[in-house]
């Protein structure tokens, strides 16, 4: 069961049993985490978490003091807690101390949390703590004046921020225009380079095609020349063969003529011999 959010009761009994937790990383630590940490000391009547600090309302003062003694200086979520009783702020600490009071650390939001007359709080804290009351009175008005001053500054800064935003938007639009012009220029340069590369490639292709056609023509001419030389060789060999045959035929004819002549001579000689023999017989 979750505790109540009410931690601003003005009766002294509630004040003595209320614990202030300062330097709290409220971005990480939630109300349930605070209740889980402090519930081990006793019953929690109320718990409220604000930006940077929190309050825990216990049922009695003894439990609250035990919780302060047990958790003061503990590190949670990367920050060292500054814990004290809400009725006993640490205004009496030395100026060189590490920890500060809640009013110094958190400004007017801490003071507004109590929601009771400032004179009563000052008198009560003066009776409980030996710290001089004028310090507490001097701190609070200065903080409140700073808040009002901050509000006026916020108004001025808001106007200035609007004008600054307008100026920034005009500068950004101008920068965007310059960037666009630069990009456009680079793109045009890239396009020119690509076009020149394409022209070079086309020229190379044309030259290569011309070389290929020339090689084809040379090869075809070489093949034609080879064919012509082959035909010539064949014709020459045929002519030489025919000439050889003719020569052979001529030689054979001459041989036959000589044989015929020799045969005629032999027949003539035989006739002469026969005639001479006949003459002798007669």
UniProtKB/Swiss-Prot annotation:
Residue stretches making up the RRM domain: 17-88
Biased composition regions of type Basic and acidic residues, renumbered to the chain: 208-217, 224-235
Localization annotation: Nucleus
Residue stretches of biased makeup (Low complexity): 161-172
GO MF term set: N6-methyladenosine-containing RNA reader activity; RNA binding
Keywords recorded for this protein, A-Z: Coiled coil, Nucleus, Ribonucleoprotein, RNA-binding
Sequence motif Nuclear localization signal, residues: 141-147
Bias-annotated ranges (Acidic residues): 236-257, 265-282
One annotated Gene Ontology cellular component of this protein: ribonucleoprotein complex
Biological process according to GO: mRNA splicing, via spliceosome
SUPFAM superfamilies cross-referenced by the UniProt entry: Regulator of G-protein signaling, RGS, RNA-binding domain, RBD
Major location category of this protein: nucleus
Top-level taxon of the source organism: Eukaryota
Pfam families linked to this entry: RRM_1
Region Disordered, residue ranges: 131-177, 208-282
Residues in coiled coil: 177-217
Family note: Belongs to the RRM HNRPC family. RALY subfamily.
Known function: Binds pre-mRNA and nucleates the assembly of 40S hnRNP particles. Interacts with poly-U tracts in the 3'-UTR or 5'-UTR of mRNA and modulates the stability and the level of translation of bound mRNA molecules. Single HNRNPC tetramers bind 230-240 nucleotides. Trimers of HNRNPC tetramers bind 700 nucleotides. May play a role in the early steps of spliceosome assembly and pre-mRNA splicing.
Assembly mode: Tetramer.
PANTHER family: HETEROGENEOUS NUCLEAR RIBONUCLEOPROTEIN (PTHR13968), HETEROGENEOUS NUCLEAR RIBONUCLEOPROTEINS C1_C2 (PTHR13968:SF3)
Protein name per its UniProtKB record: Heterogeneous nuclear ribonucleoprotein C
Gene: hnrnpc
């Amino acid at each position: 069961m979750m505790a109540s959010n009410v931690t601003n009761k003005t009766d002294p009994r509630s004040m003595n049993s209320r614990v202030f937790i300062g330097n709290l990383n409220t971005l990480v630590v939630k109300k349930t985490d605070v209740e889980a940490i402090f519930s081990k000391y006793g019953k929690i009547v109320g718990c409220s978490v604000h930006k940077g600090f929190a309050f825990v309302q216990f049922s009695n003062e003894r439990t609250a003091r035990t919780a302060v003694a047990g958790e003061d200086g503990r590190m949670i979520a990367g920050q060292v807690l500054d814990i004290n009783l809400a009725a006993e702020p640490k205004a009496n600490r030395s100026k060189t101390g590490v920890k500060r009071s809640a009013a110094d650390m958190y400004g007017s939001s801490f003071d507004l949390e109590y929601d009771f007359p400032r004179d009563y709080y000052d008198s009560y804290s003066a009776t409980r703590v030996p710290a001089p009351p004028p310090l507490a009175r001097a701190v609070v008005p200065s903080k409140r004046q700073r808040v009002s001053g901050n509000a006026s500054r916020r108004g001025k800064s808001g106007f200035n921020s609007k004008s600054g935003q307008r100026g920034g938007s005009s500068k950004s639009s101008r920068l965007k225009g310059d960037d666009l012009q630069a990009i456009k220029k680079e793109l045009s340069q890239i396009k020119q380079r690509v076009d020149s590369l394409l022209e070079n490639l086309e020229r190379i292709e044309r030259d290569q095609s011309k070389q290929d056609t020339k090689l084809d023509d040379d090869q075809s001419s070489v093949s034609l020349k080879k064919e012509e030389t082959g035909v010539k060789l064949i014709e020459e060999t045929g002519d030489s063969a025919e000439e050889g045959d003719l020569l052979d035929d001529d030689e054979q004819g001459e041989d036959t003529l000589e044989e015929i002549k020799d045969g005629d001579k032999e027949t003539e000689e035989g006739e002469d011999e026969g005639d001479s023999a006949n003459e002798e017989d007669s």
